[in-house]
């Protein structure tokens, strides 16, 4: 967590992830034996945090921790591009015209990725890992640099979901493509955690992993879970909007944390798979609110790739709750989709 702020008799935890701050009242308990519990720890190169209201008959924090960390370990084992023994990295190491048996979770995300790729006309794609490495952002990246046209053309031959095929329980490829689940894996993990908490009888919680989150129910005092959406800037923390969240996942994607500058141009880690280059437009960040944390995760990346105009049209067409922060000469311009206003509850500026 980034720090603790005191306001009157409330203690507010502020956790800074990518573009969101969680405002959570910390209370020791009520006379009925209920209490607010909090667990967290490292995961997938980052952290996770779970806050939930524990009623007297519900699972203790140690049991919740075991369940949550079991899910996170499974997702990491199947989908991490930063460990050579993960299922997806073993697949990535295979040559063209190979197949590998995969767990159902991996095949599910491949199908979701194909859907998002088709809906974005190929701009979003799960097979961008070779591009990430070429530009210096990926797990195999050696140096942040602008590649030559020849090097880019060679790598683009190994990019595109059309090179993937699901055959029963196997994932196959007809080119030496490499899959990167970083735009969907954490959201998937959060959905799995939320489902497990529900199954354990926990219905008031906020679950977060590597910045993707989902909230349901109320806090201990009956107030809603509140999320602050920050301006995409590094010099200070400014909340653009505060939203109430109940039953939705929230994800923010931006170009302001992982980038490099060359000749006055900003090159971020978000790629348009069609060109093979980082996006170059004025859309600084996108926050998506969606019933599925997985879809919020993937859609926030998709919309960031599309840019301010295409992303707006896409969000309106598909009824997506999206909060856009666009760079302008005088600072930032905010634009929200109709669905965002409908989904996000009471808000304050």
Regions inferred by a protein language model and the residue ranges of each:
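Mature catalytic core of soluble alpha/beta enzymes
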Residues: 2-8, 13-15, 27-349
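Sec-dependent signal peptide recognition
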Residues: 15-22
């Amino acid at each position: 967590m980034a720090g603790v702020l005191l306001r009157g008799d409330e203690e507010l935890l502020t956790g800074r992830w990518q573009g969101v701050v969680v405002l959570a009242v910390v209370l020791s308990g009520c006379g009925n034996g209920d209490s607010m519990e909090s667990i967290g720890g490292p995961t997938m190169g980052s952290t996770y945090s779970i806050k939930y209201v524990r009623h007297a008959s519900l699972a203790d924090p140690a049991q919740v921790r075991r369940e949550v960390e079991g899910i996170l370990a499974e997702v990491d084992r199947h989908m991490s591009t930063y460990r050579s023994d993960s299922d997806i990295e073993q697949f990535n190491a295979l040559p063209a015209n190979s197949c590998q048996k995969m767990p159902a979770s991996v095949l599910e995300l491949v199908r979701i990725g194909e859907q998002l790729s088709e809906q974005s006309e190929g701009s979003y794609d799960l097979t961008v890992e070779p591009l990430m490495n070429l530009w210096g952002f990926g797990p195999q990246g050696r140096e942040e640099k602008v590649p030559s046209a020849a090097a880019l053309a060679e790598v683009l031959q190994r990019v595109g979901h059309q090179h993937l095929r699901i055959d029963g329980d196997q994932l196959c490829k007809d080119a030496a493509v490499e899959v990167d689940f970083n735009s969907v894996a954490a959201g998937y993990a959060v959905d799995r955690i939320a489902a497990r908490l529900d199954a354990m009888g926990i219905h008031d919680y906020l679950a977060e992993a590597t910045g993707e989150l989902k909230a349901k129910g109320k806090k201990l005092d009956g107030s809603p879970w509140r999320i602050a959406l920050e301006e995409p800037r590094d010099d200070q923390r400014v909340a653009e909007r505060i939203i109430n969240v109940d039953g939705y996942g929230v994800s923010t994607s931006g170009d302001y944390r992982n980038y490099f500058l060359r000749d006055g141009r900003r090159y971020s880690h978000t790629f348009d798979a069609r060109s093979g280059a980082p996006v170059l437009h004025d859309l600084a960040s996108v926050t998506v609110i969606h019933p599925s944390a997985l879809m919020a995760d993937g859609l926030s990346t998709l919309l960031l790739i599309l840019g301010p105009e295409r992303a707006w049209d896409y969000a309106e067409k598909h009824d997506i709750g999206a909060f856009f922060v666009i760079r302008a000469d005088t600072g930032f311009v905010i634009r929200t989709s109709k669905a965002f206003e409908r989904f996000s509850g009471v808000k304050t500026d």
